[in-house]
Amino acid sequence: MALKDTGSGGSTILPISEMVSASSSPGAPLAAAPGPCAPSPFPEVVELNVGGQVYVTKHSTLLSVPDSTLASMFSPSSPRGGARRRGDLPRDSRARFFIDRDGFLFRYVLDYLRDKQLALPEHFPEKERLLREAEFFQLTDLVKLLSPKVTKQNSLNDECCQSDLEDNVSQGSSDALLLRGAAAGAPSGSGAHGVSGVVGGGSAPDKRSGFLTLGYRGSYTTVRDNQADAKFRRVARIMVCGRIALAKEVFGDTLNESRDPDRQPEKYTSRFYLKFTYLEQAFDRLSEAGFHMVACNSSGTAAFVNQYRDDKIWSSYTEYIFFRPPQKIVSPKQEHEDRKRDKVTDKGSESGTSCNELSTSSCDSHSEASTPQDNPANTQQAAAHQPNTLTLDRPSRKAPVQWMPPPDKRRNSELFQSLISKSRETNLSKKKVCEKLSVEEEMKKCIQDFKKIHIPDCFPERKRQWQSELLQKYGL
C-alpha cells in the first residue's frame, strides 16, 4: 500500500496493482481511454477481495478461460469489462476489486485457472458448494470434473477421492465374491435361485452381511502380595475393526469413534473401540445381531528385560472374527407360495395324526356289511384312491414326509365303541385326580396306615453297645 497526494492536502490509499501501473507509466493518466494500441485499463497484478479473503493474482490468470465470468469482468474488450472500465467494478475500502462469493472456496477456483487442473484435499466435504461456485463463474470444464463426483457422493453417500474410489471398487469386488461363494455353496433349490438372482440380476448386495473383528490386549493382575496365586483377567480396551455401518448397528452408542471421526458408513475402519471392557457383553451383542464366530487367534506379547514383571509375562493379544451371512432374498410371490405349501403340509399332518388316533382306521366311510374279505376288488380300488396315512410324529416343514402303509380296516361300530370306552376311562381318571380328600378322610386314612404298622415282640440281640442301650431305654 502507498499514499498518493491529490494536491489539495489530502491523500488516498493505493493498492499494489495501482502502484505497479503508476510505476510503469508515471506520466500517463490512470483513466486514459484505450486506443487500438493503448495499454489495458487493468494492471498486470490484480488484488481481489472475495468474501473477505484477499487474493493477489496476475491479470492473465483471470483471463485464462475466455467464456468465464471473471474473463468478462476483467477483459477490456468485453462489454462488461471494457465499456464499464475498472472504475465501475465494486471495490472495498482499500480499493481492491470486491467479489461477493465464498472466499474459502475461491482458492480452488483460482488454482484451476492457473493450470486447468483440480487438486482437492482428501475427505473434502465442500464439493457441492464448490460445484455451485464453478457454475457461478461459468467454468464448464470444472463443472464437468465435479459433477460425476457429486453424483457419486449423493448416490453412495461416499467421498470421491482416488483412495475412496479404490475402496469402493475393492468393496464391490469382495461383495461379489462373497455372493458367488454363497451361491456355489448353497444347495440346488429355492435358496440357490435366490442367491443367483442377486448375483446375476445386478442388484445391490446385502449390506447387512459382513465381517467384524474384535481385538484386545489382555493381562492378568494380582490382588495383593500375599495372594500371588489369585490372578484375574484385565482388559484395557476392546478394539473393533470392520465396516462402520455394521459396527454402529451392533454396538450403537457404546462405540467410541473419537480416533476415526467423520468416516462414511460404507467405509472400513480399524480404530474404533468399545466404551466397556467386558468381552461377554460384546459377544452377546454380536449374537443378538445374528453374527457367529468363524475364527480366532491369540499370541503372547514379549516383555523387555527391564520390564520383566508378572503383568508383562501374563499378557496376550487376541482377535475374534465374526461373520453374518447374507440374508435370503425372497420375492413376495415366492413367499406366498411357500406359505401355501406349509399350510397344506400342516393340514396333511394333522389329518394323518387324527387318523392314527382313531385306532389307525381308514378315514373313508364304509358300510357295516362290507368287509375286506367279502369284496376284495373294492378293497383294492379303495386302497388305490386312498392316500397313505401319516405317522404320529409331525414332520418339519422342510423335511420329507414319511408315509406308512394303510392298516387293516374295521367296522365303524367297533370304532365307535372303542372311542366311547376310551373317553369314559379318561374322564374317570381325570375325576380321580381332581378329587380332594376332606380332613376327616385324611385322618381316617392316617389311622388305618398306622394300624398296619407291626412292632415285633422281641428284637434280636445287638452286638453294639449303643443299640442295646437304646432298647433298654425304651423297655423293648
From Swiss-Prot:
It comes from the Eukaryota. Interacts as a tetramer with GABBR1 and GABBR2. It comes from Mus musculus. Residues 331-412 are annotated as: Disordered. GO terms for cellular component: cell projection; postsynapse; postsynaptic membrane; presynaptic active zone membrane; presynaptic membrane; receptor complex. Residues 350-391 have a biased composition (Polar residues). The gene is Kctd8. Gene3D superfamilies: Potassium Channel Kv1.1, Chain A. It is found in: Presynaptic cell membrane; Postsynaptic cell membrane. The keyword Membrane applies. Residues 44-122 form the BTB domain. The modification Phosphoserine is found at S78, S413. Residues 333-349 have a biased composition (Basic and acidic residues). Keywords: Cell membrane, Cell projection, Membrane, Methylation, Phosphoprotein, Postsynaptic cell membrane, Synapse. SUPFAM superfamilies: POZ domain. Auxiliary subunit of GABA-B receptors that determine the pharmacology and kinetics of the receptor response. Increases agonist potency and markedly alter the G-protein signaling of the receptors by accelerating onset and promoting desensitization. SMART domains: BTB. One of its GO terms (biological process) is protein homooligomerization. The keyword Membrane applies. This is BTB/POZ domain-containing protein KCTD8. The modification Omega-N-methylarginine is found at R80. CDD domains: BTB_POZ_KCTD8, H1_KCTD8.
